[in-house]
């Protein structure tokens, strides 16, 4: 990974290309971010930068975080994330990272926390087929068979069962950058990204782009 930025999901809309085709896009408020800390191979064993996004009152931070920002001379930020970059040496503490590091046509990977759905059954959670809905059926939306009785006489680990759905870290790969608006710190990517509106996103250059 050579570049990355933090952002906030605004929502989805559509724009039209030169041929008049509608393109579904997600609008992301990306940056500006500030480099809070640098990590080097000599001192930390790996190369990375710690970036902060979105200003916050100092009174809302705990004492260790207040000291962390004061030590590096950076204004307090709401979000802190670490980006492991190959060329972290070119960044300096206090340097601002803006959305114009990306250009239209590039491919990016977007990471976020998926929408939480609460406790759900196997049909919604895993896409399983329901049972017969006719009269006399013993089940409709139940799990079905969970294993044999005599052998192995247990349910194998990993069996798809009802449970809490969503609220997990999800990365969507190879999304195309459609438009960049540096004046308003907006990044438009083709397709959908995980998370609710105003949720935190990590945008990085694609690692598997062809």
Curated annotation (Swiss-Prot):
Keywords of the record: Ribonucleoprotein, Ribosomal protein, RNA-binding, rRNA-binding
InterPro entries the record matches: Ribosomal_uL3 (IPR000597), Ribosomal_uL3_bac/org-type (IPR019927), Transl_B-barrel_sf (IPR009000)
Cellular component annotations (GO), alphabetically ordered: cytosolic large ribosomal subunit
Protein's UniProt keywords contain Phosphoprotein: no
Superkingdom of source: Bacteria
Keyword rRNA-binding: yes
Biological process terms in GO annotation: translation
Molecular function per GO: rRNA binding; structural constituent of ribosome
Purpose: One of the primary rRNA binding proteins, it binds directly near the 3'-end of the 23S rRNA, where it nucleates assembly of the 50S subunit.
Family membership noted in the UniProt record: Belongs to the universal ribosomal protein uL3 family.
Quaternary structure note: Part of the 50S ribosomal subunit. Forms a cluster with proteins L14 and L19.
Name listed for the protein in its UniProt record: Large ribosomal subunit protein uL3
Organism: Caldicellulosiruptor bescii (strain ATCC BAA-1888 / DSM 6725 / KCTC 15123 / Z-1320) (Anaerocellum thermophilum)
Lineage of the species this protein comes from: Bacteria, Bacillati, Bacillota, Bacillota incertae sedis, Caldicellulosiruptorales
Underlying gene: rplC
């Amino acid at each position: 990974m050579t570049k990355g930025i933090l952002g906030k999901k605004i929502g989805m809309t559509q724009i039209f290309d030169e041929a008049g085709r509608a393109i579904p896009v997600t609008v992301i408020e990306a940056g500006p971010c500030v480099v809070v800390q640098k990590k080097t191979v000599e001192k930390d064993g790996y190369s990375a930068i710690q970036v902060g996004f979105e200003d916050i009152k100092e009174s809302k931070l705990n004492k260790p975080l207040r000291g962390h920002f004061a030590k590096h001379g950076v204004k307090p930020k709401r979000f802190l994330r670490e980006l492991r970059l190959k060329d972290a040496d070119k960044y300096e503490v206090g340097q601002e990272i803006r959305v114009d590091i990306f250009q239209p046509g590039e491919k990016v990977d977007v990471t976020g926390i998926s929408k939480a759905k609460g406790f759900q059954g196997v049909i919604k959670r895993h896409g399983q087929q329901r049972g017969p809905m006719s009269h006399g059926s013993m089940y409709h939306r139940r799990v079905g068979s969970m294993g044999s009785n005599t052998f192995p006489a247990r349910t194998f680990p990993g069996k798809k069962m009802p449970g809490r759905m969503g609220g997990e870290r999800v990365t969507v790969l190879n999304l195309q950058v459609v438009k960049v608006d540096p004046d308003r710190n907006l990044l438009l990517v083709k397709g959908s990204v995980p998370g609710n509106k105003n949720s935190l996103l990590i945008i990085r250059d694609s690692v598997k782009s062809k």
